[in-house]
Regions:
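A polyanion-binding, active-site-adjacent surface
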Residues: 2-3, 14-162, 166-169, 174, ...
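Short, contiguous pre-domain boundary segments
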Residues: 5-9
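C-terminal substrate-binding/active-site "lid" region of AdoMet-derived donor-dependent transferases
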Residues: 196
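Polytopic transmembrane helical bundles with strong interfacial aromatic enrichment
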Residues: 199-200
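Ligand-binding clefts/hinges and TM-proximal coupling segments of bilobed small-molecule sensing domains
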Residues: 223
Length: 224
């Protein structure tokens, strides 16, 4: 696993010393040696690598990584550029188009968002190939909860975008009045028509950032 560095390492270093993390590290290491696991080990912490703590303006919470070949690269909802765009991201792009008029790109790589301060964080950071939720309950939730708690304590406005019930369960940790919490159903085809479409998270986020003197996010994903 490519280790955390910089601000996130400083903020979360206490977690690495806890028994749950030592158990998690050993379990994940064994899984990578004996099974096909996604994302590639060096990409596990990409959400933290691409978006340093001091630069976080927006947090989008996902669940666990995509579990088919070549998809996951450590950013929730994002896929590598030559991979078919997954259905949930198709719906995110449709809402982005309806909300802000952004062109719908031909790829699903959201690195541009991450580099502008959008932390694309799954609550579980690894998964077995073709087995959704297979690494739930082995310790990742405790680790990512610690990251969410660090974000909650930041003394500056941050937007938390919570899509679907698992993400919305994290709301109990978000009690800092400086932050904005946006909730909607998950963009999955199973639930997008229950209120995800029309929720306008992207324009609401930018309005909040601008109202607080921060540069808005350029949500347009460019062709690569």
């Amino acid at each position: 696993m490519a280790p955390l560095s910089g601000e996130w390492l400083e903020a979360l270093k206490g977690e690495f010393r806890k028994p749950y993390y030592r158990t998690l590290f050993q379990k994940v290491g064994e899984e990578y040696q004996t099974r096909k696991i996604f994302p590639p080990a060096d990409d596990i912490f990409n959400a933290f690598h691409f978006t340093p703590l001091s630069q976080v303006k927006v947090v989008i919470l996902g669940q666990d990584p995509y579990h088919n070949d070549g998809q996951a690269h450590g950013l929730c909802f994002s896929v590598k550029k030559d991979v078919e765009i997954p259905p949930s991201l198709v719906n995110i792009y449709q809402e982005l188009h309806d909300d802000l008029g952004c062109r719908i790109p031909s790829h699903g790589n959201l690195t541009k968002w991450a580099k502008q301060g959008v932390l694309l964080l799954n609550t579980v950071l690894t998964v077995r190939a073709h087995q959704a939720n297979s690494h739930r309950g082995i310790g990742w939730e405790e680790f990512t909860d610690a990251a969410i708690q660090v974000l909650n304590t930041q003394d500056r406005p941050i937007v938390f975008i919570l899509w679907g019930r698992p993400a919305q369960l994290k709301k109990r940790m978000l009690n800092n009045p400086k932050h904005l919490i946006l909730e909607a159903p998950h963009p999955s085809p199973l639930s997008a028509y229950r209120g995800f479409f029309g929720s306008k998270p992207f324009s609401q986020t930018n309005q909040f950032l601008e109202a607080n003197g921060l540069t808005p996010i350029d949500w347009q994903i460019d062709e690569l």
